[in-house]
Regions:
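Catalytic-core regions of glycoside hydrolase
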Residues: 89-93, 146, 157-175, 179-406, ...
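Structural motif
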Residues: 9-15, 46-50, 70-72, 118, ...
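C-terminal non-catalytic alpha-helical accessory regions
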Residues: 367-375, 386-585
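Feature activates predominantly on carbohydrate-active enzymes
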Residues: 2-6, 10-31, 51-199, 209-213, ...
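Extracellular/lumenal ectodomain signal focusing on beta-strand-rich modules
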Residues: 113, 216, 282, 644, ...
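Generic recognition of long tandem-repeat/solenoid scaffolds
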Residues: 67-71, 97, 452-463, 630, ...
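Short, well-ordered secondary-structure micro-motifs within conserved domains or adaptor modules
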Residues: 34-56
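Extracytoplasmic
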Residues: 564-738
Length: 738
């Protein structure tokens, strides 16, 4: 049943309720164009009630178009009226509540929030002032947040042209604004291992005294930080004493994030925590974690709760890359959209939330700006309502933030954006459909262009289509060029590769710049370095990466240019090798992580590996490298099980490595069916100088090893490549007949 709340009245009972009434009235005016009345029906009452269980809970009593929202104070009342708004449809002057929302509401998790630090590296926050931060607090509270996290010290970061304030100045007035809403304030405050204890305590004392509200301090153990694990906890204990002498109710939450350089950090950390220091209130885990989450919970004394620090903002080179459970995000998107693009990933983060929920008391996400806005709402809603339907959350997101649009269509569009990133974009016509969803909503409601959240989603949808169209077009050119090359007509092959895009492509590309201008004015998001002062190309500067190669077209053109100075006969032989770079004969095998993914390897990789993605680096993906080399697998071991090799035949194994070898160690090895093929210094084997010179970019090298017929078992081989200290970094290999 639906309920008409058009031209509603609002009344308040209690001091906090009066302030909540003012905030609620502003929300109604923003959506309906008028403020609520003081008397009459329909009616909503906001009531302060000390009998409510805690300040994070609220009660809604509904009788038709008469609603009573009860809470202890301002926090719960904001949750209550926001929940009402999440279930309302606004159409012109009409307000329709879509269902009865009576109930007692309490959160699943104690800690629910997001980081919003003011420094030079975020893609949005550095452009904000008090008005934007206050709006942000209200928006995240609409989905149940009770804490924000600031960064009071800029550290080594320098202010950029967008920053109007000093980070500490922001921390002061931002914490004051948060306090008005009874929102907890956490501070991410790293230790400097070069700073002596006296200086560290003195500098922090000034911050603690300056900020009106501090509820928690989060010193990361690493990323950044290089202190030993035991020294780190001892320093945190001292800081905690200083903190609590100024803010008695504030808590100390160090993180179990370890410096890469310190292999004993986890044990040193635990040795201090096992002494049960009273000054430590809980432990945080996040990127560069010293322990897997279940291992941390098993080993950490039970008196210490764990707070999660989920990275919901990054796509590659991070703790939870796109498709983190299989790490197969296609290089066409990874190159062009890069590490910090607009990234709604609702189903992925629902999975992550379900995996981590049993271990933690809550979370404060790692965020660098507006690009992860959908993820914030999804994560927070699950922290409050763990069993909520994901589709319902997305419809709530649309009704609350994009009230001009059809909520179900926006929810479908957001899910569509996530589905756009499945598989090879050239094989995903769904990408065009997703864009049509947003374009259709814009046609029905042009005022959506005034809503930054809609423009952000539209921007992403158009980016995806641009990549889809470019990759499809270029793959067709490459197929034709290969046909010409196979007949020896390299001039026609080259001409085919030089074919330009059509006019529609350039219109679509230009629209991205237009949307970027709008978004910069609306929310301050920085979509390139030159025009909007992004901190760098991987800091959400999508316009600086969107045009990077998504096929081998640029590399093939580069190879044609390299052949221009060669004699004709040599030139043709060279170009033939270029076009046949990855070609294999019957009974041979070629593997590229970028082109083929892990699924073809017949065995799961061991431990926590890292993909050192190269494709969004303009100095790498500039025509000097084929797509097959863009993903570099970084781990202590690489394993695979292969078959189909011919009996009684000797083979060669050629592996392409990233140039990260370390001559300190002689423990690099390659095994085939358990037998040592090579063991010694990096990388051993023989050099294939011609292949390296003609086919590899300068960051890579290759080595060739013998695979005698005796190591194969009925045409099968299990390969293991590894090194126990620093690991190996490889991108491709080929097994071919000797």
């Amino acid at each position: 049943m639906k309920y008409d709340f058009s031209f509603l009245s609002v009344s308040a009972f209690g001091e906090a309720a009066e302030y909540a009434c003012e905030l609620f009235s502003e929300e109604i005016e923003l959506r309906a164009g008028y403020r609520p009345f003081e008397n009459g029906e329909p009616c909503i009452e906001l009531v302060c009630d000390d009998s409510i269980a805690d300040k994070d809970s609220f009660v809604i009593e509904q009788d038709g178009s008469h609603l009573i929202i009860k809470a202890q104070g301002i926090r719960g009342l904001i949750y209550g009226y926001s929940y009402f708004l999440r279930k309302c449809v606004f159409s012109s002057n009409k307000i329709t509540l879509i269902k009865n929302i009576s109930g007692n509401y309490s959160p699943d998790k104690k800690i629910r929030g997001h980081q919003c630090g003011y420094r030079s590296t975020p893609n949005t926050y550095d452009a904000w002032g008090p008005e934007e931060y206050f709006r942000f607090y209200r928006d995240i509270m609409a989905f149940g947040c009770n804490i924000c996290e600031h960064i009071p010290s800029g550290g080594k970061d320098e202010n950029n042209p967008l920053m109007k304030y000093h980070p500490l100045e922001v921390a002061v007035w931002a914490s004051e604004l948060a306090d008005k809403l009874d929102m907890d304030v956490s501070c991410w405050y790293p230790n400097d291992d070069k700073e002596d204890e006296e200086s560290a305590l003195a500098s922090r004392r000034k911050v603690f005294e300056a900020m009106p509200r501090i509820d928690a301090i989060f010193p990361p153990g690493g990323d950044p930080g290089e202190m030993d694990g035991d020294d780190f906890i001892k320093r945190c204990i001292k800081i905690s004493d200083t903190l609590k002498s100024i803010k008695p109710d504030a808590q100390m939450w160090p993180s179990a994030q370890a410096p890469h350089s310190n292999i004993t950090w986890p044990e040193d950390f635990l040795s201090e925590m096992n002494k049960l220091p009273e000054e430590i209130d809980g432990i945080i885990t996040g990127p560069n974690h010293a322990f897997m989450m279940d291992d941390l919970r098993r080993k950490l004394p039970s008196k210490y709760p764990i707070r999660f620090y989920p990275d919901i903002t990054h796509n590659v080179r991070c703790e939870y890359p796109v498709h983190f459970d299989r790490d197969d995000w296609h290089y066409a998107f990874a190159s062009t959209l890069s590490r910090e693009s607009v990234n709604p990933r609702p189903t992925e983060f629902r999975l992550l939330h379900r995996l981590t929920r049993p271990y933690v008391v809550g979370s404060v996400s790692y965020s660098e700006g507006a690009s992860d806005d959908v993820n914030k709402a999804v994560w927070s809603d699950m922290d409050y309502f763990p069993d909520v339907s994901l589709y319902e959350t997305l419809c709530d997101y649309a009704r609350f933030f994009l009230w001009q649009a059809d909520a179900s269509n926006i929810a479908d569009g957001i899910l569509g954006l996530e589905k756009n990133w499945e598989g090879d974009p050239a094989e995903n016509p769904h990408i065009e459909h997703t864009l049509r969803i947003f374009e259709a909503e814009l046609e029905k409601a042009p005022s959506l262009m005034e809503n930054w959240r809609f423009v952000l989603l539209l921007f992403r949808a158009r980016c995806d289509v641009l990549v889809y169209r470019r990759r499809r077009f270029e793959l067709e050119l490459i197929d034709e060029a290969k046909n010409f090359a196979s007949r020896g007509d390299f001039a026609l092959a080259r001409a085919e590769l030089m074919t330009d895009y059509d006019a529609d492509y350039y219109v679509l590309r230009a629209s991205l710049g237009q949307l970027a201008d709008i978004l910069f004015e609306q929310i301050g998001i920085q979509l390139d370095v030159e025009n909007y002062h992004a901190a760098g190309w991987e800091r959400g500067a999508t316009l600086d990466t969107i045009d990077l190669p998504v096929t081998d077209r640029a590399w093939l053109i580069n190879r044609f240019e390299a052949s221009d100075a060669m004699p004709e006969g040599e030139r043709e032989a060279f170009l033939t090798r270029v076009f046949n770079r990855n070609k294999i004969n019957s009974g041979e095998y070629y593997f590229s992580l970028a082109e083929h993914g892990f699924g073809v390897l017949g065995e799961r990789q061991r431990g926590e590996f890292y993909i050192d993605y190269q494709g969004d680096r303009r100095e790498v993906n500039n025509g000097s490298i084929p797509m097959c080399m863009l993903k570099a697998f970084d781990n202590y071991t690489f394993v695979c099980k292969l078959a189909g090799f011919e009996p009684d035949t000797d083979y060669k194994l050629r592996v392409t490595f990233k140039k990260t070898k370390n001559d300190m160690f002689n423990t690099f090895y390659i095994k085939a069916n358990g037998k040592d093929i090579y063991r010694g210094k990096f990388y051993g084997g023989e050099k294939d100088e011609q292949f390296e010179r003609e086919m590899l970019q300068e960051r890579f090298t290759c080595a060739v090893y013998d695979l005698p017929a005796s190591v194969f078992e009925n045409g099968c081989i299990a390969l293991e490549i590894g090194e126990e200290h620093v690991g190996v970094v490889l991108s491709e290999f080929k097994i071919y007949k000797a």
